[in-house]
């Protein structure tokens, strides 16, 4: 899922605005570039709120059984994936990261991805050889959503402990690959509901299983790191 593996880091690394720097330049030291702004509404946050607002629209269009409904659903998901990257890019380049944005970004990603997975589970995919297979998307969906719930709990617990544990659950490359394959897989699966793209279904299913495998693998890696830290206490 669009997760904290990618999104939180993007929103986590920026200081206050230019005006505050000019006001305080003669009276106090400049803030660290790694300090988060306390502003609630910034451009990246607006984009993130847009992703949250798009979730019910995605659900509504998914059940519109005509070409424009399928097109709208796929387009909404693609737009969400693009803004997931864009809000982090803007936050880095324009130094608009905020505490609220750092909290909201992974929440928006999880909502969009989980909603899409659940929607796909409600309409069984039709495999060329096996016909309708109810569990084809359900199995990797359980793995992906279960992993995200587990990691959210683990990260919250680690944040309340010492710095070593927080470092143990920091972003790794597996999480980034998992997110990339997940977004591509879900885009393909949504698009393949249209007869023009149904030949892409096997590749979408395959990528979803790859994403589920990477999800479990990255969870194991995180748990091993945490275990090593706990053993050193």
UniProtKB/Swiss-Prot annotation:
Annotated spans, Disordered: 1-23
Record has Transport as a keyword: no
pH dependence: Optimum pH is 8.5.
Record keywords, A-Z: Endoplasmic reticulum, Lipid biosynthesis, Lipid metabolism, Membrane, Microsome, Phospholipid biosynthesis, Phospholipid metabolism, Transferase, Transmembrane, Transmembrane helix
InterPro entries xref list: CDP-alcohol_PTase-I (IPR050324), CDP-OH_P_trans (IPR000462), CDP-OH_PTrfase_TM_dom (IPR043130), CDP_ALCOHOL_P_TRANSF_CS (IPR048254), Phosphatidylglycerol_P_synth (IPR004570)
GO cellular component, one term: endoplasmic reticulum membrane
Keyword field contains Lipid biosynthesis: yes
Cellular location(s): Microsome membrane; Endoplasmic reticulum membrane
EC number in record: 2.7.8.5
Origin superkingdom: Eukaryota
GO molecular function: CDP-diacylglycerol-glycerol-3-phosphate 3-phosphatidyltransferase activity; manganese ion binding
Cofactor(s) in the UniProt record: Mn(2+)
A biological process from GO: regulation of embryonic development
Entry protein name: CDP-diacylglycerol--glycerol-3-phosphate 3-phosphatidyltransferase 2
Organism: Arabidopsis thaliana
């Amino acid at each position: 899922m669009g997760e904290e593996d990618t999104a939180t880091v993007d929103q986590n690394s920026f200081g206050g605005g230019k005006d505050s720097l000019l006001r305080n330049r003669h009276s106090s030291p400049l803030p660290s570039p790694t300090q988060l702004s306390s502003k609630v509404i910034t451009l990246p946050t607006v984009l993130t709120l847009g992703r949250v607002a798009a979730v019910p629209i995605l659900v509504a269009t998914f059940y519109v059984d005509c070409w424009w409904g399928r097109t709208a659903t796929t387009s909404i998901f693609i737009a969400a994936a693009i803004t997931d990257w864009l809000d982090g890019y803007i936050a880095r380049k324009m130094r608009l990261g905020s505490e609220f944005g750092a909290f909201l970004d992974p929440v928006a990603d999880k909502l969009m991805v989980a909603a899409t997975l659940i929607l796909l589970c409600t309409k069984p995919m039709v495999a060329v050889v096996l016909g309708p297979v109810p569990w084809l998307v359900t199995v990797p969906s359980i793995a992906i959503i279960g992993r995200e719930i587990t990691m959210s709990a683990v990260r919250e617990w680690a944040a309340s402990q010492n710095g070593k544990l927080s470092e143990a659950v920091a972003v790794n490359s597996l999480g980034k690959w998992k997110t990339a394959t997940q977004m591509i897989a879900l885009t393909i699966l949504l698009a393949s509901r249209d007869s023009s793209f149904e030949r892409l279904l096997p590749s979408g299913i395959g990528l979803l299983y790859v994403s589920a495998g990477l999800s479990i693998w990255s969870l194991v890696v995180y748990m091993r790191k945490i275990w090593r830290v706990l053993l050193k206490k």
